Amino acid sequence: MAKSSRRYKEIAQKIDRDRLYPLTDALALVKEVATAKFDESVDIAINLGIDVRKSDQVVRGAVVLPSGTGKTVRVAVFAQGDKAKEALDAGADIVGLEDLAEQVKANEINFDLAIASPDSMRIVGQLGQILGPRGLMPNPKVGTVTLDVASAVKNAKAGQIQFRADKAGIVHCTVGRASFSVDALRENIIALVDALNKSKPATSKGVYLRKMAISSTMGAGVRVDHAGIIN
């Protein structure tokens, strides 16, 4: 514990908490202090100017990160017939319908993302209490309930992430690994910011992207001057 506290203190001393760092500098600093014995994730928190109490100001969506996530994603697809074949051909790890639903009910959940064809939702809808709390319930708003299951599978395998503002209006996402280059991480963040801008509620007033900070799994947060990447 003492060793961990000392390490965190050393990291914190390298970061000026009152400074807004240019994105490239912030990423370089996050990589520098990511000294754990594993490949730490690089995470971002973005405060949005939305009123989360209003139903028309929900910010939710998905984006394919151009440099990927650095994570191997196991994809399950609820489908049958031609759609099941399309999913398998696209690289899905698990495909099924009633049989897959029974596995889920038995708490045998061996996947990181679930996709469903619209006609399968009569079965998948029964799994909400199991998949919902795990963040695995297919949803058309993020493209995981779709007729084009093949594209959904390919996007997931290519590094697609989902985002959603929490009750405080903050979006938390993993945008890569500490082993990624600064340029690769920067490309991913720009793609996420672009997706957030496209998801801006029409009723949102004032400044939309308010604050941004990045950190590694074991590192301290670095505040980012996001003025140059908001458009």
From Swiss-Prot:
The organism's place on the tree of life at top rank: Bacteria
Spans through the membrane: none
Subunit structure: Part of the 50S ribosomal subunit.
Gene Ontology biological process terms in this record: regulation of translation; translation
Any one Gene Ontology molecular-function term assigned to this protein's record: tRNA binding
Alphabetized SUPFAM superfamilies for the sequence: Ribosomal protein L1 (SSF56808)
InterPro entries per the UniProt record, alphabetical: Ribosom_uL1_bac-type, Ribosomal_uL1, Ribosomal_uL1-like, Ribosomal_uL1/biogenesis, Ribosomal_uL1_3-a/b-sand, Ribosomal_uL1_CS
Cellular compartments per GO CC: cytosolic large ribosomal subunit
UniProt xrefs under Pfam families: Ribosomal_L1
Name of the protein in its database record: Large ribosomal subunit protein uL1
NCBIfam families with a match to the protein in the record: rplA_bact
Summary of the function given for this chain in its UniProt record: Binds directly to 23S rRNA. The L1 stalk is quite mobile in the ribosome, and is involved in E site tRNA release.
Family of this protein: Belongs to the universal ribosomal protein uL1 family.
Key word RNA-binding present: yes
Gene: rplA
Keyword entries, A-Z: Repressor, Ribonucleoprotein, Ribosomal protein, RNA-binding, rRNA-binding, Translation regulation, tRNA-binding
